[in-house]
């Protein structure tokens, strides 16, 4: 996965203007989409699903323009089992709508609904920062998709592995554990990577904590998980 994407803001604004016209053009397939208010922001979100992909169009009614959109795409390089559960978010924002937490809100909608997210082969600097921020609140890691096989690599990878186009980031939606996702998608490598992650965390803890003689106890590895339906978003 490479952090090398750069966008032309002029082209993005033109695309958003074209989409806005289609959303308000009677007879067009984008006309009359369902609407959800985006909190107290004054913005609204028009949404649709097509061919297993989810489209969120964020409209600013006062300005009569689109602030941006997010599409949760299917990835052709994923195995069929994984395609049912993983989507790759793709976002475009108008310049005036950037750095206001809009993309974060839309990604959280998907994650909180139980959708698991996977990155594309390339990201912009802004997208990479967003994924890193979300990783503080959601289970995360890296996966390898080479040969249309999904293999878990752990919560951190070496620089050369990170830079490979078949390495992707992963964010788990609400209610999922790595084990459940591995079982649902056929993802391999979870047990080995989890063992490595535990050893790393244990080593860091031992380096930064003061030993207490006679009070050592095993680390609990179980946690209560509130489960949600693991079917794809509808």
Listing of model-derived features with the role each one plays in the protein:
Residues 1-81, 116-234:
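Terminal substrate-recognition subdomain of acyl/acetyltransferases
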Residues 80-95:
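Conserved acetyl-CoA binding element of GNAT-fold acetyltransferases
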Residues 93-112:
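Conserved acetyl-CoA-binding loop-helix of GNAT-fold acetyltransferases
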């Amino acid at each position: 996965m490479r952090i090398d994407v750069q966008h032309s803001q002029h082209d993005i604004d033109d695309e958003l203007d074209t989409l806005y016209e289609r959303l308000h053009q009677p007879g067009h397939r984008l006309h009359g989409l369902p609407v959800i208010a985006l909190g107290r922001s004054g913005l609204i979100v028009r949404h649709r699903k097509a061919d297993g992909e989810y489209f969120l169009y964020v409209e600013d009614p006062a300005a009569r323009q689109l602030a941006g959109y997010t599409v949760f795409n299917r990835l052709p390089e994923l195995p069929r089992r994984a395609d049912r559960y993983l989507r790759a978010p793709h976002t475009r924002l108008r310049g005036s709508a950037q750095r206001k937490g809009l993309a974060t809100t839309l990604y959280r909608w998907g994650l909180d609904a139980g959708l698991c997210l996977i990155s594309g082969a390339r990201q912009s600097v802004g997208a990479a920062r967003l994924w890193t921020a979300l990783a503080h609140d959601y289970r995360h890691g890296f996966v390898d998709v080479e040969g249309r096989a999904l293999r878990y690599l752990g919560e951190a990878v070496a620089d050369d592995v990170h830079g490979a186009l078949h390495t992707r980031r992963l964010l788990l939606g609400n209610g999922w554990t790595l084990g459940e996702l591995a079982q649902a998608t056929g993802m391999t490598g979870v047990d080995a990577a989890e063992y490595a992650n535990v050893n790393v965390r244990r080593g860091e803890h031992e380096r930064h904590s003061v030993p207490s003689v006679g009070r050592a106890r095993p680390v609990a590895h179980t946690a209560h998980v509130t489960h949600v339906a693991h079917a794809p978003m509808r």
